[in-house]
Amino acid sequence: MQLNDLKPAKGARHQKLRVGRGIGSGKGKTAGRGHKGQHSRAGGYHKVGFEGGQMPLQRRVPKFGFTSRKELISAEVRLGELNKISGDVVDLASLKAANIISRQIKRVKIFAAGKLEKPVTIRGLRVTKGVKAAIEAAGGKIE
């Protein structure tokens, strides 16, 4: 087999259905749209979500919850990602410099996922119990 011989598997691609091309085709005359009515005509169709005057689903069900504004400036960082930081001090600035978090982030929590391979000092960041134990086991500290 050569690159110029490549082709899709048999039955993987379907021929486009050509409608309105004579009665012998099986899809001539009305082209699968039936006779008369709104659906047979060009342009007009139903409004999205309209249920014929019945109260639509999106208005029947109650509203709930809200979007927390804290979530926009918060991030979670895996413990294993701290290995990417060149220095031994981990704070917001060093995480941004290492491209681990985006610039608008102001709150960070480190959670235990991955392995820490060097002792680090955590400054001004929240950590889980597992991370605290892992950092102290690696010879680092949390300030």
Swiss-Prot record:
Pfam families for this protein: Ribosomal_L27A
Q: Does the keyword RNA-binding apply?
A: yes
Of the GO CC terms on this record, one is: cytosolic large ribosomal subunit
Which domain of life does the UniProt lineage start with? Answer: Bacteria
- Region feature (Disordered): 20-52
**InterPro entries, alphabetically?**
Ribosomal_uL15, Ribosomal_uL15/eL18, Ribosomal_uL15/eL18_sf, Ribosomal_uL15_bac-type
Basic residues compositional bias: what residue ranges? Answer: 30-39
Record GO terms (molecular function): rRNA binding; structural constituent of ribosome
What are the alphabetically sorted keywords of the record? Answer: Ribonucleoprotein, Ribosomal protein, RNA-binding, rRNA-binding
Keyword Ribosomal protein found: yes
- Any one Gene Ontology biological process term? translation
Alphabetical list of HAMAP family matching this protein: Ribosomal_uL15
Q: Which family is it part of?
A: Belongs to the universal ribosomal protein uL15 family.
* Role this protein plays: Binds to the 23S rRNA.
Per UniProt, subunit arrangement is: Part of the 50S ribosomal subunit.
Q: What is this protein called?
A: Large ribosomal subunit protein uL15
- Lineage in the entry? Bacteria, Pseudomonadati, Pseudomonadota, Gammaproteobacteria, Legionellales
